[in-house]
Amino acid sequence: MYETRESLGSIRFCLGKEDGRMNLAARKHSPPNLRNGILAAVIAAFALAPVALCAQADCLACHGDATATDATGHSIAVDGQKFGASIHGSLQCTNCHADIKGYPHPDKIAPVDCKTCHADQAAALKNSVHADSKDHPCTSCHGNAHEIFPKTDARSAVYPLNVPKTCGQCHSNGGMAGKHGLPSVYPNYIDSIHGFALSKEGLLVAANCQSCHGSHNILSHTNPQSPTYKSNIPKTCGTCHAKIEADYEQGVHGKAVAGGNLKAPVCSDCHTAHAILQPTEAEFRMQSTPICGSCHKDKFSTYRDTFHSQLGSLGGYVETARCWDCHGAHDVRPASDPSSPINQANLIATCGRCHAGANASFVKYQPHANARDRKLSPALYYIRLFMNLLLAGVLIFFMIHTILWVIRSRYNQVKSKAANGGKNA
């Protein structure tokens, strides 16, 4: 409990304007007993208060001056209008600056401890990747401490449309990213389908940084509790893409991940995490096959031998069939599954999407025929073996023929020279 004399000093700080005396409107016109009662009540209230709750106007008498600076030249100005409109506008200055008990106050005051009110957020932050960052106080994300607005207010630094720019202060090329080795993801995000929807179209439902990473409790992607941990990514993306998540869970990839196989692909393996393109874009279609090939190397190799691949890679024809045009995208199923587009019963319909008039003979074509695999393609395997043996036999035959021809030619030259008495013919 603070001493009465300290509380009295606080009364002068809060209510005194010139010489510390109370300036009550009824001072001259109230009966003495009433004035004394009011004074006693005020003194009692402040005597019991641990910290003087001073009116904002008293602080703004100095800090409301836009040119106000401290001894180091750092601005200590506070915009009274903006502060009044902020989420903290109803608070008194000393609610946050609790070590100030009177005026004049020390030049150096204690840093504001936000967890006094925001204990849950502080606890979450303590366990996050930002916990050890000395350069990451609350104001790094929420903005000027005296101008913090609700996240639903367009003026807020954490309003959905503003979040990428706020995070980009650190996670962009140079600056904090270069200094601390942070991922520089802002440039990729802002050009992605999510970034375009947010920044160009103003869609509040488009995914921003918080949508995937969280806010105060941001965990490393290597932490199993993180929403960006590999096995959690389908659920995270499914927050918006519910149908796609359901399809993915029914496919071979989703079942593999659910079974603990973290080598199986999740959303970010195919779409990337931040530079997500519209699937209909030419760039995405051109990139999609090598992405599948990074896991399915044998199938990618045989695909590259096909007309589909050569038309796309050499001819630059974007609309040629890619892996997902035949196998599906999210609910990829084995050929043995009756619902798979590459099941024998569905091949005519699958091929018919591009090849009108496709029939039973047409779908006998083997898109992944492998002449090196005797079990998969026995006819091709033996044809290739025969052609290789034929080629080798022809080369060996003519190599022997050439060597014998050279020997015979040399022999004839020597014989002819001997017949002419040592002279060349």
Residue positions per predicted region:
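Short sequence/structural segments immediately N-terminal
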Residues: L24, P50-A425
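Bacterial N-terminal signal peptides
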Residues: G37-V51
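A generic alpha-helix propensity feature with a strong bias for hydrophobic helices
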Residues: I11-F13, P32-G37, L53, I109, ...
